[in-house]
């Protein structure tokens, strides 16, 4: 089974940071990315299980994958929405 997280364009390691810092760092990273690029977010903050999906929905980015069964949590975000 291929690792969906392995081919990310960029990686943001937010381990050790607590809400709201991980989402603030994600927002800053995404601002410097081109539409369609992907960002792997690594975090150990339990609040990210709610905050990262909410951020993606609010900012109209695509959450391609998430692994929250064990630490560290991993999320794969694509900047922007998929073309319809």
Curated annotation (Swiss-Prot):
It is found in: Cytoplasm. Pathway: tRNA modification. It holds the Pfam family TusA. GO terms for biological process: tRNA wobble position uridine thiolation. The active site is at 19 (cysteine persulfide intermediate). GO terms for cellular component: cytoplasm. The keyword tRNA processing applies. The keyword DNA-binding does not apply. Keywords: Cytoplasm, tRNA processing. CDD domains: SirA. It comes from the Bacteria. Transmembrane segments: none annotated. Its main location: cytoplasm. One of its GO terms (molecular function) is sulfur carrier activity. PANTHER family: SULFUR CARRIER PROTEIN TUSA (PTHR33279:SF2), SULFUR CARRIER PROTEIN YEDF-RELATED (PTHR33279). HAMAP family: Thiourid_synth_A. Interacts with IscS. Sulfur carrier protein involved in sulfur trafficking in the cell. Part of a sulfur-relay system required for 2-thiolation during synthesis of 2-thiouridine of the modified wobble base 5-methylaminomethyl-2-thiouridine (mnm(5)s(2)U) in tRNA. Interacts with IscS and stimulates its cysteine desulfurase activity. Accepts an activated sulfur from IscS, which is then transferred to TusD, and thus determines the direction of sulfur flow from IscS to 2-thiouridine formation. Also appears to be involved in sulfur transfer for the biosynthesis of molybdopterin. Belongs to the sulfur carrier protein TusA family. This is Sulfur carrier protein TusA. The gene is tusA.
